[in-house]
């Protein structure tokens, strides 16, 4: 490996030229000669920075509208040359050793995501020379420092000046470079798969034969699902959508844990379904209470009072701005782990700062971005499915009992059905006036989920006569209907589809319960 004081030449070829002038100036201060391609070189020259254009060095012009400029033996030889053993051949062909390579690529991902761009426009933004330079530099990391992220530049220059640019630092930059080229190739490959009409005709384009996902670490977490498990949080590369836990900003509180993030995601995705002010409280992966009201304070109080025992230590999410009165009410009412809001008032911030342990996540504007693929890791495998983004479609629903639902019952049916989608199976949700009353979650039989909801109702002394029941899947037997009727349920919404549907409908008619079949199931495991 060459000594740091032998670093003499740098090649710069960047598509994103932000801060490149400052970078070049620091290289010049360190008496490092600059080589660059046309566009980058012109910017440096305009800023009075001495630079040698690649075409002047190679004595070969950029051709084909700039598509061929760095792929030349004098460039590749300068990067791949090993100074210990290639000096003679480099001298013979007048090849200048290149010690630092600074490159970023054509913005393929950005261009492909602009809908008005046709395939020719997109393909023209596939970088060829850039990835070649980076791969060659990373391969020869013992002799060449490769930088693909300008955030690494200052620390690199400092290491060069301090003569501490050791093999570990070089290897780390090379590793980052290969990650960069790998991700670039991946998004290009995925684009071609999506555009391949022949592939679309013969394969399932949503689920190709081979898939690759690229994530970057956002942060280390306090611990995993249990205290003895270490954990980190990774997010999709180049993701910019607001309104997700992945893009949320934590403005106060302790370091998030694995369970905090998992529960927060459920709470946020559930509350995003509602247009009126809504509150969702989640505990151990399940909504324990949900409420919709005319303002944020009432929605919180309704949700909290629905199940105050389960709300203790829960995750609270809202779909509207958190004000000071609601913030004060929350800290007066309960112990809370995380509060999630799209925005927060300055006075509410000051109130919550009195309880510094409360984690507060601000998501920005909420939007319906829960589309695409849903992933679940298993041992040595990955389950991939479409996200359960089923929207309410009244036209597909069937009103199967003698009595049709009243306006209130229909409204509550819609509300309970929206909540049931986020409750672990077997899921039973009782609700009235857009407030959950009792939730039975995660039982191995549907009747026991129903009994659990009944126990919650009875323990809290609630009168639920006239309330609605939602079931995430069909009832295999009439016992669930009878159990619900025993506490006063007057309307039921469920997918239908059981071989005993006729028996189930008769049971509902016997109890004068109205029943809706949605023809869609919402299992959650």
Curated annotation (Swiss-Prot):
> What GO molecular function terms would the record report?
IMP cyclohydrolase activity; phosphoribosylaminoimidazolecarboxamide formyltransferase activity
Transferase keyword on record: yes
Query: InterPro entries from the xrefs?
Result: AICAR_Tfase_dup_dom_sf (IPR024051), Cytidine_deaminase-like (IPR016193), MGS-like_dom (IPR011607), MGS-like_dom_sf (IPR036914), PurH-like (IPR002695)
| CDD domains recorded | IMPCH
Q: Which UniProt keywords apply?
A: Hydrolase, Multifunctional enzyme, Purine biosynthesis, Transferase
**Which Gene3D superfamilies does the annotation name?**
3.40.140.20, Methylglyoxal synthase-like domain
Q: Does the keyword GTP-binding apply?
A: no
Q: Which Pfam families match?
A: AICARFT_IMPCHas, MGS
Domain annotation MGS-like: ranges: 1-148
Which reaction equation describes what this protein catalyses?
A: (6R)-10-formyltetrahydrofolate + 5-amino-1-(5-phospho-beta-D-ribosyl)imidazole-4-carboxamide = 5-formamido-1-(5-phospho-D-ribosyl)imidazole-4-carboxamide + (6S)-5,6,7,8-tetrahydrofolate; IMP + H2O = 5-formamido-1-(5-phospho-D-ribosyl)imidazole-4-carboxamide
Give the UniProt record's GO annotations in the biological process aspect.
Answer: 'de novo' IMP biosynthetic process
SUPFAM superfamilies (UniProt xref): Cytidine deaminase-like, Methylglyoxal synthase-like
- EC number, as in UniProt: 2.1.2.3, 3.5.4.10
A GO CC term attached to the entry? cytosol
Pathways per UniProt: Purine metabolism; IMP biosynthesis via de novo pathway; 5-formamido-1-(5-phospho-D-ribosyl)imidazole-4-carboxamide from 5-amino-1-(5-phospho-D-ribosyl)imidazole-4-carboxamide (10-formyl THF route): step 1/1; Purine metabolism; IMP biosynthesis via de novo pathway; IMP from 5-formamido-1-(5-phospho-D-ribosyl)imidazole-4-carboxamide: step 1/1
Q: Give the matching HAMAP family.
A: PurH
Which comment does the entry carry about domains?
A: The IMP cyclohydrolase activity resides in the N-terminal region.
The record's similarity note reads: Belongs to the PurH family.
Q: What is this protein called?
A: Bifunctional purine biosynthesis protein PurH
